[in-house]
Swiss-Prot record:
It is found in: Secreted. Residues 60-93 are annotated as: Disordered. Glycans are attached at residue 39. One of its GO terms (biological process) is hormone-mediated signaling pathway. One of its GO terms (cellular component) is extracellular space. Residues 1-22 form the signal peptide. SUPFAM superfamilies: Agouti-related protein. Residues 93-132 form the Agouti domain. The presence of a 'disulfide through disulfide knot' structurally defines this protein as a knottin. One of its GO terms (molecular function) is neuropeptide hormone activity. The keyword Cytoplasm does not apply. Residues 64-79 have a biased composition (Basic and acidic residues). The gene is ASIP. This is Agouti-signaling protein.
Amino acid sequence: MDVTRLVLATLLVFLCFFAAYSHLPPEEKLRDDRSLRSNSSVNLLDLPSVSIVALNKKSKKISRKEAEKRRSSKKEASKQKVARPRTPLSVPCVSTRGSCKPPAPACCHPCASCQCRFFRSACSCRVLNVNC
């Protein structure tokens, strides 16, 4: 009994490995550049070349004042984006995550848009860009 179970278990494991590896594409061994060029779907000559530039010591060192100026300018730029005026809200509108089937009015949130699924049977207002 134990021998037959061992044989059946071995056969089952073999069949599992055979089923798994039969679906994988065979690996190709490339021996030289010629076979690489002929087998590749993308032509390597069409890709843009990458240039490596060495940095000198002056470009690596940034003074503390310059770094603070850059940080403050980035903060000011982000504050200017936040302070942008919003469009006035229309009175009949659909709230975010509310149903907005096509005869319904527009979404209340200025950055929201009506997205439909399942052949326009389920529609809801969604905010796509949080930073809007």
